[in-house]
Each structure stands twice: as structure tokens, then as C-alpha cells.
């Protein structure tokens, strides 16, 4: 975390870990209502508006048009323009003006303080029995302000709103820091969790949330004596500052290499002119796009070697930052009673230990090695001599050019014509309807509800017409907008107790138990629920402005990106737990990417393409010939470099583990020696190790060592699991639109959020008859389970994103 308010702690008890890692982008929300006889409110909390009676066919057509036609969107979005009273941002009743952020934060703060007083004063069995739920509500109240303010302060175009959101964010983080040092909360929760008369009355969710909070308190040093706690805070501050400096301070040892211009043959002449100097030499920079292009295109191997070595050698200052960061993390782990930082970080993950991660990565290296050798042997034939690391990009580029000239179908250039943004969103809705019985319904935003006129609002409804979630889609590019695609949960699902409803009604007739945002009544329990509210942010080109204008057309890569982000969204939508601390994507870090990675597999299989891939002008479906051409193209590119890309990701995960698994009392670290050791031991194209070549130190450019310290393996771990589920549950695409397969995946994985072990989810989805899970051996996880996942491999698709 970069924000100074976060520096005292590695992970806060009162906010979702995902939220704390996302200081750079937004998330979103809505509301609805069913009228109930017992409702104390002057307006219904969950009545669906009349326009929900629109047929699925009309909704489906509207979904495509709101994204593909600016004129249609303008008309559609103005239907509530005459509403006399503006709605707050994302329907939050407080956020009708910048000043509303202060009110929102203060009201939430008062509710938090009341809960803290209640927990600290608890003395009876009944009071202890409500403690897990009380503390979950405390977490929810903090996240309500923090998540939304964090999003708005980055995404909103108005500086006044940005500043107001920043102040609300700061206020709640400051209060959260107070909670983190309130030892009575930890003492009371541990007392409750240790009493069988209390825990016997807790649901499984309450038990899980209590254990999560106890561990979070422990990781925040609340149990330590004052002097050790202060040391913990100081170390956390140091780590935050060093981490920020490391991420932002990446720099090479040399800013450029001097090369004779006539040795740059193959590089674009325009680029050569840009870097040319007066004395027939060129200064090739060692960072940015030019060195990457040089490695791909310069014919002279000696030049490629020089550029490769210089662009992978970090400055001494940057290496010092990294090694200080690793040292402080090791000291923090020792202070917390752990063998290493990796042991501390992994204790609540699926992996559990660095030894298990090592088992997974080692098995993965072996399962991938044959494919790597096949790829490299083809490149070595092209070179006619032993392949070196600086040769790989060059000969891959040559092979791709050969393939493109000889076999690549010209019709592939027309594929984006069949992927308008509207048709892709339509396809996602149809896919979700077939797999899970939920669909996306465009909804006219109320005045003041969105932060930009281009933001589309979608309501998610089930087959009974019940409203279950809200998605705000901010998908088009605009000046100063963050370009990276992302999913944000602005408000998690959660059950709202009758006591909260009564408390809210007693405060103010206009007050709402979910701040005016989306609610619904659970048809089974008849309890009120706050619905997940999500924001999807992308950077696609805007559609044409006139009525017949060209829509935003997506590349195959962009389609996969959108499917990936919607994989996170569907986890939030379907993972509706009673407690917010474990809802949706609030699960173990090494499980969180599974739904999104699995969704990528659906994007281009024929049965799913048949749901949406139609020409934006003629409505002609994508032909079987074009689909086969796409498949051949993916297979060809995967066979050229997919396995080597996978190996590169595995090596980065191994380096991460090597750095963070060192014993806490292991003294100073030589990060370059460890990096070289991993490369020599596991790489098929290891870094040069001869005495005449100074060792490279690419680790100084590996910024994820800070944000994903000891957990960089997570993405490829989830890729391996996703590949397995794709084959064994969805039949490698044969059952991609099959309801039985969708229900199985939903019931075993998605609906649990973080309320079930990831291993139980995977084992449940595979079933006990699956050879990999014979006798349910995956359920408990452990070293052997991690090794088994490593044997599943990554295929040849390469790493997307």
C-alpha cells in the first residue's frame, strides 16, 4: 500500500485484503426493493421497478444497443432525467454533493463506535454469541466508506468530489488504525471463540469470520507487549516506504548502450533516426519499448547481447532498496513468531507453506519442460547454433513472421467486426443465463447516480425476476482515465439484521439501512440483504457519435480481458454469503483469480461464440471457417512461445519464494546471487554465467515483489486449477453452455465466496470419482495436493493480461 495511512499494518482486520491492494481504481452500486408488511420504511426497500417486466428479448436487444449506439444510449439514459431530486452517486443517499462524503463518513463512524462499545461491554452469553456478526458489521461499515471513497477519489472528474472522497477515506482509515490498537476487541473475540457455549450457536460462516479476524489481529501485533508492538509498527512503516521506493525507483545500471548505427539493421529506421547521434552511433535506451523492439528485430547478435544484458541489470541503488525490503520483512516475520516472511504470509492461503509452493512450482517446471524444449528446438534450428537468452525474442519474431506470411488467414483481420462491445456484453449475459440462470438488464441511471455520462448501469436478475446485483460499466476511454482493466466490489453482499433495520428507522425517516444502495429480501429467509455492487473499468474506444456510427470493436485479446473481469464479477454476484467478510472475491489470495481465469476459456469456444459473435453491421454470425482460423492462429502462436512464457512466470514465482522463504535470522541477502541460482537451476535458457560476463540483476525490475511478496505463484496456481476444471467440468468446451456443468461449478465454487476452503471447492467441483481427487484427497490440501496441481500443468496458452 502506498498510502501513508496504511503503513502501520501489513493487513488490516477491518477491511478486505483485496480492497487494500487497490488504491488505484473504482467499484460500484445500486438498490431495489420488495415491499414487506413488516417494513418500517415509508418507501419499499426491495420493489422491482415496473420496467423489470420487459421481456428477456427486449432486455437482450437493449443490452447490445446501450453499448453499441451512442444515440440510443443518450435517449435511454435520459428517461429519468426529469426526476426532481438528484440521486447520490451509485444511489448512496449521502453523496448528492461533495459535502455528503463528510456526512457519510461521520454517520458510519458513529455506528462503528456504537458497535465497538457494545463489543467491549459484552459480558453475557447472548452478547458473546452475536460478537462475530457484530464485528463483521463493523468491518462492513468501514468498507462501505473506504471502498466507495477510494473508487470515487480516483475515477470522478470533479476535483472537489475527489478531495471530499479523499478526506472521507482518510477519516475512516485513521479510525481503523485506532481499532487495530484496541486490544479489548481482540480479547473479547478470543474469549467468545474459546467458549463452546458460544461457538455451538455460531454458524459456519460466523466461525470462519471469527478465525479470520483473530488471525488479522495477530498479524497486526495487537497481542505483543507495547515495545514490541511499536517495533512492529516501525517495521511496517519502513516496509511500506521501501516498497513504494522499490516499485517507483526501478532503474538500470546504464541508461543506454552505444551502438554503431550500421549494426542496427532490422530495427525500424524511424526509431534508429530517433536515437542516432552525430558520430554514426546510436544510444539505445535500456528501458521502455525500444530495447524490446531491438531484441526482436536487430540482426546482429552481439548488439542483441549487449542490449539484453544492459536492460536486465539494475542499479546498485535499486538492488539496495530490494535487499533492505527483504531484510525488514524477515525481521517482521521473526517478531511475529514465524520462520520466514513466506511462512507468515502463506499460513492462511491454500498453499499454507513455502514448502508446498515449492512442490507446486517444481512439479510445474517438470510438466512444462517438454513443451519448452519443443519450442526452443525449433528456434535453434533457425539459428543453426546454440540458442542464447538474447536470441529468443528475435527468433520468435522471425517464426511469427514466417507463420503470418505463409498460413495466417487474411480473414482474421476482420474478426473485430464481429466483436462489438454490445454483442460481447450480450454474449456474457446469455452465457450467464445458460450456466447460472442470471442475466444482465440495462437500467436507466437516475440523475446524479453515475460519475460520467458514459457509465452504463446493469442490474443482474435471476430467473424469477429477482434483483440480485448491480454493475456499473465504465468501459470507454477518456482523458486522464486509468487505462488498466479492473473489477471493483463497491459493496459486498450481506444479511441486514432486523435490529439494524429497526435502528435505522428510529434514527431518521429518510435513513436507509444500506445508505440507499441496492437491497433485496431473501425469498427463503425473508431477511433483508444488501446486494453486491460492482464496477467494471476498461479502456475501450468510444463508439461513433451518430446514429449509424461504428461501435467499439474489440480484438480477441480485449474480448478475453472483458471475460476475465466478468469472471471476478460473477464471483461477487453469486458468492452472496450472510457475512460480508467472506462474500464474493473475499477469499484466499491464491484462490481469487480462479473464476476470472476460468472465464477466459469460455470467450472463444464455438458454442459460446455462437451466442454473440455477429457482424456489427449485417448481424451475420462468425463463420465456422473464421472460428477455425482463430483456433489455428492461437495454437500456432502458443506452439511458438507459450511454454517459454509459462516458464518465465514460473521462474518469477520461484525467485519470489527464494527471497521470502529465507530464515528470519539469515542475515543480509545477496539478491543477485539468489536470482542467478534460480535461473541456473530451473531455466531452459539461463542467464549467462561465464566469468567474463557480469551477472544480470533483473530482480530490480520485478515490482510485484512488493505487492505480491511470497504470493506471486497465485496466478499460475489458479491457471492450473482453471485448466483442470475447464477439462473435467466443462469438457474442454463441450459443456461450455451446459446448465448442469454451470450449476456444479456455481454450487461447489462460486456461491461460497471465501466461506469454504479453496481445496474443498476444487475437490467438490471435480468429485471423488476424479482420478486427481480419488477418495477426496484434495480436500485437506497440503504438500501432495500442491504437487498434484503442479502436475496438471498450464498448457500452452501463455499468460494473458
UniProtKB/Swiss-Prot annotation:
Disulfide bonds: none annotated. Its cofactor is Zn(2+). Pfam families: Peptidase_M3. SUPFAM superfamilies: Metalloproteases ('zincins'), catalytic domain. It catalyses: Release of an N-terminal octapeptide as second stage of processing of some proteins imported into the mitochondrion. InterPro entries: M3A_MIP (IPR033851), MetalloPept_cat_dom_sf (IPR024079), Neurolysin/TOP_dom2 (IPR024077), Pept_M3A_M3B (IPR045090), Pept_M3A_M3B_dom (IPR001567). The keyword DNA-binding does not apply. The active site is at 565. This is Mitochondrial intermediate peptidase. It comes from Aspergillus fumigatus (strain ATCC MYA-4609 / CBS 101355 / FGSC A1100 / Af293). The lineage of its organism: Eukaryota, Fungi, Dikarya, Ascomycota, Pezizomycotina.
Amino acid at each position: 500500500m502506498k498510502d501513508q495511512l496504511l503503513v502501520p499494518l501489513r493487513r488490516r482486520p477491518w477491511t478486505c485484503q483485496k480492497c487494500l491492494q487497490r488504491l488505484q481504481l473504482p467499484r460500484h452500486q445500486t438498490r431495489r426493493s420488495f415491499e414487506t408488511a413488516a417494513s418500517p420504511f415509508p418507501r419499499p426497500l426491495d420493489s422491482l421497478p415496473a420496467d423489470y417486466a420487459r421481456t428477456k428479448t427486449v432486455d437482450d436487444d437493449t443490452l447490445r444497443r446501450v453499448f453499441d449506439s451512442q444515440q440510443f444510449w443518450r435517449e435511454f439514459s435520459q428517461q429519468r432525467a426529469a426526476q426532481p431530486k438528484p440521486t447520490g452517486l451509485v444511489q448512496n443517499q449521502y453523496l448528492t454533493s461533495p459535502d455528503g462524503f463528510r456526512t457519510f463518513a461521520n454517520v458510519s463512524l458513529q455506528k462503528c463506535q456504537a458497535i465497538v462499545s457494545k463489543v467491549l461491554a459484552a459480558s453475557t452469553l447472548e452478547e458473546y454469541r452475536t460478537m462475530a456478526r457484530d464485528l463483521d458489521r463493523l468491518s462492513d461499515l468501514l468498507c462501505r466508506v473506504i471502498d466507495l471513497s477510494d473508487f470515487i477519489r480516483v475515477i470522478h472528474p470533479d476535483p472537489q468530489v475527489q478531495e471530499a472522497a479523499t478526506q472521507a477515506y482518510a477519516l475512516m482509515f485513521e479510525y481503523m488504525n485506532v481499532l487495530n490498537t484496541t486490544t479489548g476487541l481482540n480479547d473479547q473475540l478470543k474469549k467468545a471463540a474459546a467458549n463452546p457455549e458460544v461457538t455451538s450457536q455460531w454458524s459456519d460462516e460466523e466461525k470462519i469470520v471469527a478465525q479470520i479476524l483473530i488471525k488479522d489481529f495477530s498479524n497486526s501485533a495487537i497481542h505483543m507487549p507495547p515495545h514490541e508492538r511499536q517495533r512492529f509498527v516501525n517495521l511496517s512503516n519502513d516496509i511500506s516506504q521501501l516498497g513504494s521506493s522499490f516499485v517507483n525507483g526501478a532503474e538500470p545500471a546504464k541508461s543506454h548502450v552505444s551502438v554503431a548505427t550500421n549494426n542496427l539493421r532490422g530495427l525500424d529506421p524511424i526509431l534508429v533516426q530517433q536515437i542516432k547521434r552525430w558520430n554514426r552511433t546510436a544510444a539505445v535506451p535500456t528501458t521502455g519499448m525500444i530495447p524490446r523492439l531491438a531484441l526482436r528485430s536487430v540482426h546482429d547478435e552481439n548488439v542483441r547481447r549487449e542490449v539484453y544484458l544492459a536492460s536486465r541489470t539494475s542499479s546498485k541503488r535499486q538492488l539496495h532498496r530490494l535487499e533492505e525490503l527483504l531484510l525488514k520483512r524477515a525481521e517482521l516475520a521473526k517478531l511475529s513468531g514465524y520462520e520466514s516472511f513466506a511462512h507468515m504470509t502463506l499460513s492462511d492461503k491454500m498453499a499454507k507453506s513455502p514448502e508446498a509452493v515449492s512442490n507446486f512450482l517444481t512439479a510445474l517446471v517438470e510438466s512444462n519442460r517438454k513443451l519448452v524444449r519443443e519450442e526452443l528446438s525449433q528456434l535453434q534450428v533457425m539459428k543453426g547454433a546454440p540458442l542464447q537468452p538474447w536470441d529468443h525474442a528475435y527468433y520468435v519474431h522471425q517464426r511469427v513472421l514466417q507463420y503470418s506470411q505463409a498460413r495466417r488467414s487474411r480473414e482474421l483481420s476482420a474478426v473485430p467486426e464481429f466483436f462489438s462491445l454490445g454483442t460481447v456484453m450480450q454474449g456474457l449475459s446469455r452465457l450467464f443465463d445458460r450456466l447460472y440462470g442470471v442475466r444482465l438488464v440495462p437500467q436507466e441511471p437516475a440523475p446524479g447516480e453515475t460519475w460520467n455520462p458514459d457509465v452504463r448501469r446493469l442490474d443482474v436478475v435471476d430467473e424469477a425476476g429477482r434483483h440480485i446485483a448491480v454493475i456499473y460499466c465504465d468501459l470507454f476511454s477518456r482523458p486522464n482515465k486509468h487505462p488498466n482493466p479492473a473489477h471493483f466490489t463497491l459493496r459486498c453482499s450481506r444479511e441486514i439484521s432486523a435490529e439494524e433495520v429497526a435502528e435505522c428507522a428510529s434514527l431518521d425517516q429518510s435513513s436507509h439501512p444500506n445508505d440507499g444502495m441496492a437491497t433485496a429480501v431473501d425469498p427463503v429467509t425473508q431477511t433483508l440483504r444488501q446486494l453486491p455492487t460492482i464496477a467494471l473499468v476498461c479502456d475501450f474506444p468510444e463508439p461513433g457519435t451518430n446514429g449509424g456510427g461504428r461501435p467499439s470493436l474489440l480484438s480477441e485479446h480485449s474480448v478475453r480481458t472483458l471475460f476475465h473481469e466478468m469472471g471476478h464479477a460473477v464471483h461477487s454476484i453469486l458468492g452472496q454469503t450472510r457475512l460480508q467478510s467472506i462474500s464474493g472475491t473475499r477469499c484466499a489470495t491464491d484462490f481469487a483469480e480462479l473464476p476470472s481465469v476460468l472465464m477466459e476459456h469460455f470467450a472463444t469456444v464455438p458454442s459460446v461464440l455462437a451466442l454473440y459473435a455477429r457482424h456489427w453491421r449485417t448481424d451475420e454470425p462468425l463463420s465456422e471457417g473464421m472460428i477455425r482460423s482463430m483456433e489455428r492462429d492461437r495454437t500456432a502462436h502458443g506452439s511458438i512461445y507459450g511454454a517459454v512464457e509459462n516458464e518465465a512466470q514460473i521462474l518469477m514465482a520461484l525467485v519470489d519464494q527464494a527471497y521470502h522463504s529465507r530464515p528470519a535470522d539469515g542475515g543480509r541477502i545477496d539478491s543477485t546471487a539468489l536470482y542467478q541460482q534460480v535461473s541456473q537451476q530451473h531455466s531452459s535458457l539461463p542467464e549467462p554465467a561465464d566469468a567474463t560476463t557480469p551477472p544480470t540483476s533483473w530482480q530490480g525490475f520485478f515490482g510485484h515483489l512488493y505487492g505480491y511478496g511470497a504470493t506471486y505463484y497465485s496466478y499460475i496456481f489458479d491457471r492450473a486449477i482453471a485448466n483442470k476444471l475447464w477439462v473435467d467440468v466443462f469438457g474442454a468446451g463441450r459443456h461450455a453452455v451446459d446448465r448442469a456443468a454451470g450449476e456444479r461449478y456455481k454450487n461447489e465454487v462460486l456461491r461460497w465466496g471465501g466461506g469454504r476452503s479453496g481445496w474443498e471447492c476444487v475437490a467438490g467441483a471435480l468429485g471423488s470419482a476424479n482420478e486427481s481427487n480419488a477418495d477426496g484427497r484434495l480436500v485437506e490440501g497440503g504438500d501432495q495436493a500442491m504437487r498434484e496441481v503442479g502436475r496438471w500443468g498450464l498448457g500452452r496458452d501463455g499468460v494473458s493480461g
